[in-house]
A protein has these predicted regions:
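Active-site hotspot residues in diverse enzymes, especially metal/ion-binding acidic/histidine motifs
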Residues: 1-174
Length: 174
């Protein structure tokens, strides 16, 4: 059996999406899904469910994202990117069979779930552009997080986490 390296595959898939589709921030996730022939639906669910991915033999894959008023747009974008990650990374687990996963806000995350989060992070905030924008906004550190999170279409929390991951400070002097 082939050893699964989800984190490396997540990085590769995100890189390929940006370069093959010539994406610009904020990443057009509907375009990414369309290229992969994934149907995307927005529906209101119970607040505990962010979204789900479903693949059945003989049918197009489906992603449903919770568009409840309690789920802000940056959260829905992250969920959609995460579910696209399930489409790409789930093939290693179940290439030709049924595959269903729904995501909730539970703190316990499997290796695959963490890899899908990584894919979503890298798809929404590629390293090269994150570093570039961070440097470009060095003259405006007090507003940098707000400007960058709006540019990438992500929450300030997700951006700060990405900046820490890249070793870029989010601390500003007062």
């Amino acid at each position: 059996m082939r050893k699964l390296h989800f984190a490396e595959e997540a990085e590769l898939f995100a890189y390929k999406a940006w370069h093959s589709l010539k994406l610009e921030p904020p990443a057009d996730l509907e375009r990414v899904a369309a290229r992969l022939k994934i149907e995307v639906h927005e529906r209101e669910f119970v607040p505990e469910i962010d979204g789900f991915y479903l693949r059945l033999p003989g049918a197009p894959p489906v992603i449903a994202v919770n568009n409840s008023y309690v789920k802000p747009l940056p959260r829905r974008r992250f969920t959609l990117a995460h579910e696209i990650g399930h489409h790409l990374l789930g093939r290693a687990i179940s290439p030709d069979r049924r595959y269903f996963v729904f995501d909730s806000a539970t703190p316990r995350r499997s290796i695959l779930e963490r890899a899908c989060d990584r894919f979503a992070t890298m798809l929404l905030m590629p390293e090269d552009l994150t570093r570039q924008y961070y440097q470009e906004l060095s003259h405006n550190p007090s507003n940098r997080t707000a400007i960058m999170s709006a540019r990438f279409g992500v929450s300030a929390w997700a951006l700060r986490r990405r900046l820490r991951e890249l070793g870029l400070s989010t601390w500003t002097r007062r």
